[in-house]
Regions:
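Short, structured segments at the rim of ligand-binding sites
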Residues: 2-229
Length: 229
């Protein structure tokens, strides 16, 4: 029971809330965004380098951290931060998206960019949504070797991606396109950036702070992204 409302089922699939005669004010802290943090971690995996991700709940990142570590990315936890590093070659792995605490479907497009550059053959299986591989065609234009087989996508790792003009078809696919553009050789353009801006606050500014060469072209909703040097 609670002095605000009565509830049953916390920690199960069903929560029942029983109304009360009167509610009163309170304070609630919104949890950090697991997917935004994971997106920057995936960018480190794809591009290399080092990033300190602050203001998170590391336990909420466990499934993402575990997969990146399988791929050879170093992740060190301290309090509410994760230090993410990648210097060597990426290793292959398989990923299946599941409801929390499994690997999040909203991280599927971002980690696939890293899998495109991993040695060997990797597989991603989408266990939550249908038709979530629309972005694959954009990655193949950049040189990725991917084939879709039902709910799974199979990746044959390549040495590098090549710059291209690509589209963001939705929020997370758009983030994946930005990561791919940062990892690719040459200058890329990503259009339909309104999808990306809907879910990432000041993504261009944050990436610039990390050393990315990225500019926004407001007139046609395009961002131009150059490889991190």
């Amino acid at each position: 029971a609670s002095d605000v409302y009565k509830r049953q089922g916390a920690g199960t699939d069903t929560i029942r809330i029983f109304g009360v005669d009167k509610l009163h004010g309170g304070t609630y802290a919104i949890i950090p965004d697991q997917i935004e943090a994971g997106t920057y971690m995936a960018a480190v995996a794809a591009c290399g380098g080092q990033v300190l991700v602050r203001g998170i709940i590391p336990k909420h990142m466990d499934c993402i951290t575990a997969k990146l570590q399988e791929m050879g990315v170093q992740v060190e936890e301290q309090d509410d931060t994760l230090l993410v590093r990648r210097s060597g070659k990426l290793r292959r792995t398989n990923v299946k998206t599941l409801p929390y605490p499994g690997f999040p479907t909203d991280m599927q497009p971002q980690i696939t960019v890293a899998l495109c550059l991993a040695e060997g053959t990797s597989m991603v299986t989408e266990g939550v949504w249908d038709n979530r591989y629309r972005y694959v065609g954009e990655l193949t234009r950049m040189g990725a070797q991917i084939r879709v087989e039902g709910r799974s996508a199979v990746f044959e790792g390549v040495d590098h991606l090549t710059a291209a003009s690509v589209q963001a078809y939705d929020l997370r696919a758009g983030a994946a396109m930005v990561i791919a553009a940062l990892a690719a050789e040459g200058t890329s353009e990503v259009s339909n950036v309104h999808y990306i801006e809907r879910g990432y606050e000041n993504i261009i500014g944050k990436l610039r702070n990390l050393g990315a060469q990225i500019d926004s072209v407001e007139c046609d909703e395009t961002v131009e992204t150059r490889q991190i040097g």
